[in-house]
C-alpha cells in the first residue's frame, strides 16, 4: 500500500451500510444554513454506484410532487450523516437509468425476499 492509498484509507468512513443498486435508502444529509446546522432526510431508490475507494459515489432517485429528482452523494463525504436501508430491491442491472422513462407502477422494483438462516 503506497502513501496515497494509506491516506485515503484513513479518511474513509468505516460504518457504511452495505446497500446495493435497487435498494430504497434514507440518506441523512447535514445542511448548513448560516451558522446553523440541521439534518435533512432524502429517501429514494439507488439507481447507480460509481468508482470505488474514497471517490465512491451513488445516485438516489425519488419522485417529489410528480417530478423525478436525482441526487448524487459522495459516499465518504462529511455531509452524509447516515445511510439507512429501508427495503432491499431485486434487480438484474448495475445501473437503473431506465427508471427515468417509467412512471407509476411500471417504475416499481421487486422486493428481495429475505430468508434468515436457521441455526
UniProtKB/Swiss-Prot annotation:
InterPro entries: Ribosomal_bL19, Ribosomal_bL19_CS, Ribosomal_bL19_sf, Translation_prot_SH3-like_sf. Signal peptide: none annotated. Pfam families: Ribosomal_L19. GO terms for molecular function: structural constituent of ribosome. Keywords: Ribonucleoprotein, Ribosomal protein. It comes from the Bacteria. The keyword Ribonucleoprotein applies. GO terms for biological process: translation. The keyword Ribonucleoprotein applies. GO terms for cellular component: cytosolic large ribosomal subunit. Belongs to the bacterial ribosomal protein bL19 family. HAMAP family: Ribosomal_bL19. This protein is located at the 30S-50S ribosomal subunit interface and may play a role in the structure and function of the aminoacyl-tRNA binding site. This is Large ribosomal subunit protein bL19.
Amino acid at each position: 500500500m503506497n502513501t496515497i492509498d494509506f491516506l485515503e484509507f484513513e479518511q474513509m468512513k468505516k460504518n457504511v451500510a452495505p446497500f446495493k443498486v435497487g435498494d430504497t435508502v434514507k440518506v441523512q444529509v447535514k445542511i448548513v444554513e448560516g451558522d446553523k446546522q440541521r439534518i435533512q432526510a432524502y429517501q429514494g431508490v439507488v439507481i447507480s454506484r460509481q468508482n470505488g475507494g474514497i471517490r465512491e459515489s451513488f445516485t438516489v432517485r425519488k419522485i417529489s410532487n410528480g417530478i423525478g429528482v436525482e441526487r448524487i452523494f459522495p459516499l465518504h463525504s462529511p455531509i452524509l450523516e447516515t445511510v439507512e436501508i429501508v427495503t432491499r430491491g431485486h434487480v438484474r442491472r448495475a445501473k437503473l437509468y431506465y427508471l427515468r422513462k417509467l412512471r407509476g407502477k411500471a417504475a416499481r422494483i421487486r422486493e428481495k425476499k429475505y430468508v434468515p438462516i436457521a441455526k
